[in-house]
């Protein structure tokens, strides 16, 4: 019985240490989440302004824009930019988006020549490579608060591959941050660029004279616009990742406390049984005398 009590005490001590670690990780994730939410909010304000300016410019002439990034072409191949984390301990964050991507690929494509993957995050890259799915570009090691410079390579790669007609449409697949407890898997079509589905209003720039001309400006602006929208999805996904990490660590901490309570009850019962047995043995010994 003594050994059993020692084992229980060891388990309690070990679980307490684990709960301290997960509790600390929860606090770290909460701090990262707060910063990420502020970053995402600030970028959203910027993105809305960029979108308004671009929409105004596109709509500043009765003639439709002829820029290749806005022209729908026959879809022979689809590009998927899949955003995941580099590590675990984020609950169902990675599995949610990866399941969504795989399900969509199976519905839309009959063979691997019809799509390609660009992976932002080691978990996604390893997931697809383990299943022999071609990954044309991988970016790992993103910081907790990613700057555009960090993701410029993969964002530019996605836009350039589309411009080179290596694929005919691009979807960005990521977890959208709703709140600290909820995120939702999204697959947003980024290319070709379309403003119709957003319900944008007629441009205010129609009364302005453009220099050198609208098409020349759009040739420079639209790739940058697409890159900024993709970057916005990355910022959103990173916020959802921190929220998932905080929730996962909170759950782990709560579970540890529950285990500690159960072990404490088990320890008290075992100790009571041990004392009762000792008293019984003493009484039995005294009776024998």
From Swiss-Prot:
Give the location in the cell.
Cell membrane
Q: Which UniProt keywords apply?
A: ATP synthesis, Cell membrane, CF(1), Hydrogen ion transport, Ion transport, Membrane, Transport
Question: Its Gene Ontology biological processes?
Answer: proton motive force-driven plasma membrane ATP synthesis
Give the top-rank taxon of the lineage listed in the UniProt record for this protein.
Bacteria
Q: Name one GO cellular component term.
A: plasma membrane
Task: Give GO terms: molecular function aspect only.
Answer: ATP binding; proton-transporting ATP synthase activity, rotational mechanism
**How does it sit in the bilayer?**
Peripheral membrane protein
Q: Does the keyword Transport apply?
A: yes
- Family designation: Belongs to the ATPase gamma chain family.
Q: Fill in the subunit field for this protein.
A: F-type ATPases have 2 components, CF(1) - the catalytic core - and CF(0) - the membrane proton channel. CF(1) has five subunits: alpha(3), beta(3), gamma(1), delta(1), epsilon(1). CF(0) has three main subunits: a, b and c.
Q: Which PANTHER family match?
A: ATP SYNTHASE GAMMA CHAIN, ATP SYNTHASE SUBUNIT GAMMA, MITOCHONDRIAL
Q: What does this protein do?
A: Produces ATP from ADP in the presence of a proton gradient across the membrane. The gamma chain is believed to be important in regulating ATPase activity and the flow of protons through the CF(0) complex.
Query: What is the protein name stated in its UniProt record?
Result: ATP synthase gamma chain
Q: Which organism is it from?
A: Lactococcus lactis subsp. cremoris (strain SK11)
């Amino acid at each position: 019985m003594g050994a059993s009590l020692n084992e229980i005490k060891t388990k309690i001590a070990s679980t307490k240490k684990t709960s301290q670690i997960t509790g600390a990780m929860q606090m770290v994730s909460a701090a990262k989440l707060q910063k990420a939410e502020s970053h995402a909010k600030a970028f959203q304000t910027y993105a809305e302004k960029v979108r308004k300016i671009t929409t105004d410019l596109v709509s500043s002439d009765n003639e439709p824009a002829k820029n290749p990034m806005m022209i729908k072409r026959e879809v022979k191949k689809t590009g998927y930019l899949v955003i995941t984390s580099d590590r675990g301990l984020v609950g169902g964050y990675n599995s949610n988006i990866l399941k969504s991507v795989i399900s969509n690929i199976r519905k839309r494509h009959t063979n691997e020549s019809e799509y390609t993957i660009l992976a932002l995050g080691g978990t996604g890259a390893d997931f697809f490579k383990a299943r022999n799915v071609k990954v044309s570009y991988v970016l790992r090691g993103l910081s907790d608060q990613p700057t555009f410079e960090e993701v410029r390579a993969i964002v530019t790669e996605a836009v350039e591959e589309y411009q080179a007609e290596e694929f005919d449409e691009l979807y960005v697949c990521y977890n959208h941050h709703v709140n600290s407890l909820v995120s939702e898997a999204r697959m947003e079509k980024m290319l070709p660029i379309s403003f119709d589905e957003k319900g944008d209003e007629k441009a205010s720039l129609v009364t302005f004279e453009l220099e050198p001309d609208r098409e020349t400006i759009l040739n420079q602006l639209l790739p940058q616009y697409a890159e900024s929208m993709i970057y916005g999805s990355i910022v959103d996904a990173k916020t959802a990742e921190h929220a998932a990490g905080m929730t996962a660590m909170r759950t782990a901490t709560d579970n540890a406390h529950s285990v500690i309570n159960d072990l404490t009850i088990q320890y008290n019962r075992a100790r009571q049984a041990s004392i009762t047995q000792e008293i019984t043995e003493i009484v039995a010994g005294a009776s024998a005398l």
